[in-house]
């Protein structure tokens, strides 16, 4: 069973519904890191209620100033418009965001007895987001396997 890191956006919603349909969704965790699109968390809550999947929110929004000038967290930085392949989309990078969320989710997964954490990174993301690359996922998986006594 998996704990799903669930923003409430399209990618993680598809992942949650897929795992739920397979009987593998143990719970869902949204992380409020001070993002502008925090309204997605309410969508996540509603979808989890609809499915009967336990839902929690980790509020780390007080860390927002530490993330620097990302257009997703800093209201003084404009949100770019256009194709994700465009150079200007790099302003949407929140440094180390997935590592932070995966660490929090791994701790929660251990606490609730889930045997894995799932997050919706995909190949369309990793051209812009370094923490969506396959080598990142593999490295984090290796680290998480040794960070807890099983």
Residue locations for each model-derived region?
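ATP-dependent adenylation/nucleotidyltransferase module used to activate substrates
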Residues: 1-150
